[in-house]
Amino acid sequence: MKVLALRHSVAQVYADTQIYIHDETKDDYENAFFISNLTTHNILYLNYSVKTLQILNKSGIAAVEIQKMDKLFTLIRCNFTYDYIDDVVYLHDYSYYTNNEIRTDQHWVTKTNIEDYLLPGWKLTYVGYNGNDTRGHYNFSFKCQNAATDDDAIIEYIYSNELDFQNFILKKIKERMTTSLPIARLSNRVFRDKLFKTLVSDHSKIVNVGPRNESMFTFLDHPSIKQFSNGPYLVKDTIKLKQERWLGKRLSQFDIGQYKNYVKCINNLISIYDMYHEKPIIYMLGSAPSYWIHDVKQYSNLKFETWDPLDTPYSDLHHKELFYISDVTKLKDNSILYIDIRTDRENADWKTWRKIVEEQTVNNLNIAYKYLSTGKAKVCCVKMTAMDLELPISAKLLHHPTTEIRSEFYLIMDIWDSKNIKRFIPKGVLYSYINNIITENVFIQQPFKLKTLRNEYVVALYALSNDFNNREDVIKLINNQKNALITVRINNTFKDEPKVGFKDIYDWTFLPTDFETNESIITSYDGCLGVFGLSISLASKPTGNNHLFMLSGTNKYFNMDQFANHMSISRRSHQIRFSESATSYSGYIFRDLSNNNFNLIGTNVENSVSGHVYNALIYYRYNYSFDLKRWIYLHSTNKASIEGGRYYEHAPIELIYACRSAREFAKLQDDLTVLRYSNEIENYINKVYSITYADDPNYFIGIKFKNIPYEYDVKVPHLTFGVLNISDSMVPDVVVILKKFKSELFRMDVTTSYTYMLSDEIYVANVSGVLSTYFKLYNAFYKEQITFGQSRMFIPHITLSFSNKKVVRIDSTRLNIDFIYLRKIKGDTVFDMAE
């Protein structure tokens, strides 16, 4: 949902939009809670409070102040990610298709012939990183840019088996127009940038697990971050390949040579980051034109020094000349060298050309060896061709997509590799490598071992759920890693499947109860955004590919009502109850009935079950930004930090009742996952709370009324307002609490309206209006370790007779309290109080 804050109403009506007027009788937190549970997508928030907007944004719900109608129109027609700290709105708006254009934030794409293969009459527009160049389109009080581009489709095409780009991009545009927006993917670029800038400023050692190509821009400016991936393809790995011949297959209609060079240079750069954690000088031989250097400089202040007889316009220092092996002495330490020398073929015949290429390959390799033979902190990426060669067995082979598969591949070596054992590799084996293997990731670092790191902050986004990881080892890592942000696939199946298919692999599934974390926040993508200063306008949908975000070591753990809080917890319930269910009271009715409380009079205002916990369990697929386990734990330890708002703390028994209701719901829905989740949350409640039951009571609290509107034959009809199991020495402690609650007890609006047979020969009258105070009293006794209340649900009633009677119904009648007392069962009254 998105909240657009206005000082005055608007005349125009928008679809899926609701108006909320700030309620001055409620504080900012209550207003935020009510807004978050509205069911429309767009909320026009009138007479707004800035504090309420802050609360919503911290909760991951995008809430933006609007001063002018053009702002309203811009934000209401599309989704966006909002940086509420720096006041920047990143639109995810594809309406630019109506201008017959596709967009890119990659400058190198504009230098290709891609426009020859677009839809008729269409053009390509460059918009800068994350749409930075579109800021001039929006003259707003906040910074605004459109981060939507078609780079995802362009890159997918490059790695696909499709050749016809026009058909491919047409299909992708149609898909985009007919399916829901992949909001997490779009906002993820904004999130990654914000996340790692924050972490680098707070932590000296950071480990990142499982990055993919889409992350490479973020890490260009963070050389200190240690990367772990799936490992490289080494020269020694070619021993598994059979010999093949030249294939000559075209991969792309438009020229993607710039992309190939781009990612190979980044491959090289990340390799030296991994070893030395500093930004190097980047040397390039055969550099022209390298338009992609412009893209690199959008993300980081890296320095390029280049050699080529042709121009390299974005180089910091370009030598318009050839580079010879004798020039290697000009190259400094703490550098990377990218050798891409290849003479143009011009009119040479095939045999002559092949001889030239092989000679240049040997020359390139010799330059690389000489560069690596002296000095320190060096890595080299060198262009090779398929030929009989001796190569270091530990050197890394690269074959990123290029316009055509021919004879070229690349080799990355560091100083140690260049001195390692060399193996003879036949030309046919190298052709087999070129023909069959595409390097899909610029991150080729070693795999991460699932073990706790003492001094590092571990980030593992979408990397650990794969079933090639041992599930128990993943759980152990998350439980024990002190500082981390780790995601795992949430189990949102209905049959409690332990693993689910994803693309060509399987992922383990998890629930929050699988982890035993202390001081860790377990939330959704939306909830995690709020922690790092971002919010989003479109909540995550239960697609089957959703993840738990687990933040360990965060200083926001105790801020329970600020981050990963209960905002939107009733939204799914409202959507169902006010549209599909038998009555809008269905949730209240079901919760009472499933706990054997059959008095439904006033059930919507006096419910015996925690609606928060119930909704968090049965609708967890729709909103798990609320960290239920943390909420339970902080209440159980009395460590919850509440910033504001009228806050009702549930008694632990109310939480138990909620689990029982959710379990009943799950059985009716045949939802095995919710069934397990409910059982495990109930077990967790019993673990963190020391709940004892007065199932063998020796004292009770009684309430005598001045008026009983029914006939009765018991001596003193009264309401048993809870039973206790205490020693006589604890009576004074009970009396202290009763005196503390005196005013609230006598203020209760107690009513009755019918009689019924509680069981055979027990004739009783119903009592309404006391449950809220009962649970508050329960909490007070619990905190003083006084055993109060039984394991079965408290059903307030007045016993009228110990014989069978005809039930009667009367108009709701108020019962006036005469006095309240504490009495020993089968004994004397030890305390009483009147108003």
UniProtKB/Swiss-Prot annotation:
One of its GO terms (biological process) is viral process. GO terms for cellular component: viral nucleocapsid. It catalyses: a 5'-end diphospho-ribonucleoside in mRNA + GTP + H(+) = a 5'-end (5'-triphosphoguanosine)-ribonucleoside in mRNA + diphosphate; a 5'-end (5'-triphosphoguanosine)-ribonucleoside in mRNA + S-adenosyl-L-methionine = a 5'-end (N(7)-methyl 5'-triphosphoguanosine)-ribonucleoside in mRNA + S-adenosyl-L-homocysteine; 5'-triphosphoadenylyl-(2'->5')-adenylyl-(2'->5')-adenosine + 2 H2O = 2 AMP + ATP + 2 H(+). Residues 693-835 are annotated as: 2'-5'-phosphodiesterase activity. Its EC number is 3.1.4.-, 2.7.7.50, 2.1.1.56. Keywords: GTP-binding, Host-virus interaction, Hydrolase, Inhibition of host innate immune response by virus, Methyltransferase, mRNA capping, mRNA processing, Multifunctional enzyme, Nucleotide-binding, Nucleotidyltransferase, RNA-binding, S-adenosyl-L-methionine, Transferase, Viral immunoevasion, Virion. Residues 246-428 are annotated as: 2'-O-methyltransferase activity. GO terms for molecular function: GTP binding; hydrolase activity; mRNA 5'-cap (guanine-N7-)-methyltransferase activity; mRNA guanylyltransferase activity; RNA binding. This is Protein VP3. It comes from Rotavirus A (strain RVA/Cow/United Kingdom/UK/1975/G6P7[5]) (RV-A).
